[in-house]
Amino acid sequence: MTKHIFVTGGVVSSLGKGLTSASIGMVLERRGLRVRMQKLDPYINVDPGTMSPYQHGEVYVLDDGSETDLDLGHYERFTSGKLNRDCNYTTGQIYLSVIEKERRGQFLGKTVQVIPHVTNEIKRVIKRMGGDDVDVVITEIGGTVGDIESLPFLEAIRQFSLDAGRENCLYMHLTLVPYLKAADELKTKPTQHSVGQLREIGIQPDVLVCRCEQSISRDDRDKIALFCNVEPEAVIEEKDKDFSIYEVPLSLVDNKLDELIVKKLGLTSAGSLDMTPWNDLLHRLRNPRHEISIAVVGKYAEHKDAYKSIYESLDHAGMHHDAQIRIGRIQSSDIEREGAERLLSGFHGILVPGGFGERGVEGKVQAIQFARERNVPFFGICLGMQTAVIEYGRNVLGLEKAHSTEFDKDTPHPVICLLDEQQNVIDLGGTMRLGSQPSRLVADSKAIQAYGREEIDERHRHRYEFNNEYRKAFEDAGMRFTGLSPDGGLVEIVEIDSHPWFVAAQFHPEFKSKPLKSHPLFTDFIEAAINRRKQRVTEEIASETEKPTAS
């Protein structure tokens, strides 16, 4: 029988339910259990695909083309499972499914209501995650207890234990125990009230995971347990991690959360826990042999979640090379005002990620020109590849006003144009070229050197592509097209051989990087940045040596 863990959050938002859920999934996998992850989001959008990064953070794309919440990135990075569209549902999807069933007459003339029809649909998508090939399903409920948007989901998971059996369900509530500096004490009252709201709905938490700045004393732990009706050992401390999010699983293990879950759910098939690879990972993170700085030049750089997977992938590659990565978040629009020289000098590598819309595009072009002309390792992703093509067209081929038709429909040199399949598309949501697509790599390229194989599959999210009418001109001018779709029609990777490391990809490699298995393109990019730093140190030493001495 599949066991279910439901993770809710209270007191405030942004407590880290996704990271905690992913950490639990990883630890249970380390005990030999088969785990599936799911996120239920209470917003009415069908998916986050059309939401602003400032509102929602990055959109995380799955192999099947689903545009999902960024928490699914945590799930895939921490656990071994490949997720699909069943792993992320929104209120919009749930209501859409219910309305479509009503239109087909599946409710036989009944009045369609939140209870039972909407809650039944929610229970259906949760139940579908189980099966003979899975031991534990971890379902995270988005939002905060007390929000009106979350009520149907909370009611559904309350009912779910009646259907599946209370012994097969575990309710875990993530809460905040704030520290008041003036009183020099932790306050448990917000947690008590949050749990009280859950109990009013009919859910008694089995485990409380308490986010805190300071350690929770035994007295406070006993107090929380008493007022929230849980056992003292079920009050789990989760202190803030200033060093790395990859400490979270070890913190939960130190608090014996995995043992508690195994005990409460009767997971007799669970084996002993081996966290050796994770401990080794953190050892490398704490003891770097190199320190390099990478500039991420983006449209949404001031919002830390907008490029979440990019930053994590850089850290993965850094750990692979025993390197500490200092990330400079540079607004591309700032480069337009202040210049690339002022903002980018001193970085050992430059990465230009994806984005939509014209704002800041010229700043990206200037950043790429700086990287190309100064021989700074450069990595372009999605729009980063397209702007690399635009920059090369303007400044190397001499194609004045070369641009993408996304930003200038009347450009005399449309080096980037709309995909043929997108010509008649009107709707924005879910209509891009999405999900995993195959590519073939060209021999004697940096791409094939990184991957070590000719055929790859990577995740995409775009409407525009390189215009093949310009392919020969670019090749003659020194830009190589080293990754192509199987039919050769779509450009997937571009490189410049005369540059130490200049690689740009139309796809999103950041969605397939993991802490214990860094993505090969990120791995080689960071290696190039390390070499750049070594070269600069050598040049500085040589310069000092050549200075004349006083007579």
Curated annotation (Swiss-Prot):
CTP binds at S13, D147, I148, E149, K187, T188, K189, P190, T191, Q192, K223. Residues 1-267 are annotated as: Amidoligase domain. Its EC number is 6.3.4.2. Keywords: ATP-binding, Glutamine amidotransferase, Ligase, Magnesium, Metal-binding, Nucleotide-binding, Pyrimidine biosynthesis. GO terms for biological process: 'de novo' CTP biosynthetic process; CTP biosynthetic process; pyrimidine nucleobase biosynthetic process. It catalyses: UTP + L-glutamine + ATP + H2O = CTP + L-glutamate + ADP + phosphate + 2 H(+); L-glutamine + H2O = L-glutamate + NH4(+); UTP + NH4(+) + ATP = CTP + ADP + phosphate + 2 H(+). UTP binds at S13, K187, T188, K189, P190, T191, Q192, K223. PANTHER family: CTP SYNTHASE (PTHR11550), CTP SYNTHASE-RELATED (PTHR11550:SF0). Catalyzes the ATP-dependent amination of UTP to CTP with either L-glutamine or ammonia as the source of nitrogen. Regulates intracellular CTP levels through interactions with the four ribonucleotide triphosphates. This is CTP synthase. The gene is pyrG.
